[in-house]
């Protein structure tokens, strides 16, 4: 019984992401560039028609500017609105697209089960509907898995990827996380902020039990991406996890290595002569939920990656 209460508490706490996203998390020091900027406001909102389904989207900045946009993918039980802490820092540097995944937010319930392949198809469909030929992709949790699947299946549509607390294989999660997800029911969330937020946003507020069931089934299914397929992803990858994340650190490290991390030549010479193919960041004292309070830090780490900024060598070390 105590174990079930602990699982329920973990999930209900995740609901606070949606509530806190609109006002930022307390106790987090924001960078000067983000502090000086106002909370990003979408330049356009609407619905994208994708194969008979309608997906709510938000865009920031000018998609026709010629600069590759960043597609932001939210996690389970969340919405594009809940990703505001991450969007803020990126929207001052590039166009940003966010949308509500099937069953979530203002998109609402759609027929059929959830699969990561379908979610990747949906994301590409939104890009096509917005006439965006390709985008860099940042995904958190469920969105991180979707970003990996997108990069494997649609190499021409996906530029760089920022995988935040996401995996390429189901066993990348700790077993306890998978066990917890297998036990969720609509009753787990009864009266929780998460359920209330869903009903506030959704055009199908009565479908919350269906959302819970579809997410539970999606997380129980096999969505593993073969190591060879991950290694073959064309563009660069950054992996960001917390040191107390639901993602196993061994998996994050393996994903980093598969994507070209661990440059032994650079290790031997002591510096990176050019921007690497893969980057790995492990945030200290940070959990799977807590990483959403690190929006400014995530953008500060990710923007140089997206811009292919060459790592700095301190003066006095090279001729």
How would you label these PLM feature ranges?
Residues 2-3, 8-12, 17-68, 93, ...:
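Alpha/beta-hydrolase fold catalytic core
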Residues 233, 239-241:
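Short beta-strand/loop motif that positions the catalytic acidic residue
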Residues 53-106:
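Conserved HGGG/HGGXW glycine-rich cap/lid loop of the alpha/beta-hydrolase fold
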Residues 243-286, 294:
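Conserved loop-alpha-helix segment in the C-terminal half of the alpha/beta-hydrolase fold
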